Amino acid sequence: MILLTLLLISSIAIVSAIDTDSSDNQILSVEKSVNQNIFKINHPPENHHELNDLNPTKKSVSKNFDFFGIFDFLFKGEKKYGYWVWSGDMDKVDFDKLSKNGVNVVFLNSYAFKDHGYKDVMNWIKKANDHGIEVHIWMQIFNTGEWISPVKNGTPNTGYFNYKIEEAKYYAGLEGVSGLQMDYIRYEGNAYKDPNGTAAINEFVKNYTKSVKEVNPSLTVSATVMPEANATYYYGQDIPKMGEYVDVIVPMMYKGNYESDSEWTKNTTDWIVKHSGDAKVWVGLQTYQSDFNVTDMPADELLKDGKFAFDNGADGVIYFKWGMNEELDNKKLN
């Protein structure tokens, strides 16, 4: 308690010393940079649109002073570092190396149960846990090889919703599973054609989270989102509303697909954090150049983007995918 009191007193002194004029100039610079950015969608390619409604407000002092990292640690918890792991890569994962490099969470694709069998997957989960690594089951919701509409005959596709929720409840009850990861919780890019689509997705996310937490209240539920201001219009993803239901928002910040740079990563992380409510934000970073150039992203560039993500409010960094840049030294970001 004495330590916290001293920290609070020191923080007040720091806040009072801020140069307001200088801060305002920095904000104008950030606003200009963000509004000049172009968000490009990999598919469908015709859906390119400007990020014209981002208007970041002043960043909190905690993002500008390392001193406040103490508060982040005390109140936000440990930073998360992890990988999405495809079923086909499951047996190749080296937990010794991952643990050594600071990885503490993996998203294992749910098809691993079909491809490897229950026993092998459970042994894999236990091995991960023994290395201090959480396992979250990564589920593909509205795309399992083909797109499935969240709406059927103008109303929520409840039959399909119930099917996926029952599947999720099964995973939620497995020993050693720490979380569930909803991927493809969206439209392909044509949500604007369905006026009930966003509401249907919100209903699914709400019911999914409620149902799995009835099985295991300690589960961490996350949802991947498109890192775009117009995510509702194109994908049916109302990020602020989703943030009311899930524990973690995972924006897919694949800058290569957007033909963007690290400045885009920084500014977009800031926007996502400000629009995710109480949900934590674990930024998804692409381990390769882009979907059009599948060569490794330089390790130092990935770590730089990870630092930008944390500096702008993220609570974790998840790399897509394991098998490329799987030996990143994440401890450099602590």
Segments from the language model and where they lie:
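Aromatic- and acid-rich polysaccharide-binding/catalytic face
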Residues: 108-111, 178, 183, 234-263, ...
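Boundary/entry segment of secreted carbohydrate-active catalytic domains
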Residues: 47-98, 223-227, 288, 320
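Active-site-adjacent "subsite" loops/lids of carbohydrate-active enzymes
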Residues: 121-129, 134-175, 300-305
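Active-site groove signature of glycoside hydrolases
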Residues: 163-196, 318
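Catalytic domains of carbohydrate-active enzymes, especially glycoside hydrolases
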Residues: 89-114, 174-179, 248, 309-317
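Substrate-binding cleft of secreted/luminal carbohydrate-active enzymes
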Residues: 253-262, 279-334
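Aromatic-lined substrate-binding rim segments of carbohydrate-active enzymes
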Residues: 93-98, 105-143, 192-215, 219-221
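Aromatic-lined carbohydrate-recognition surfaces of secreted/lumenal glycan-active proteins
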Residues: 82-86, 136-140, 200-236, 279-290
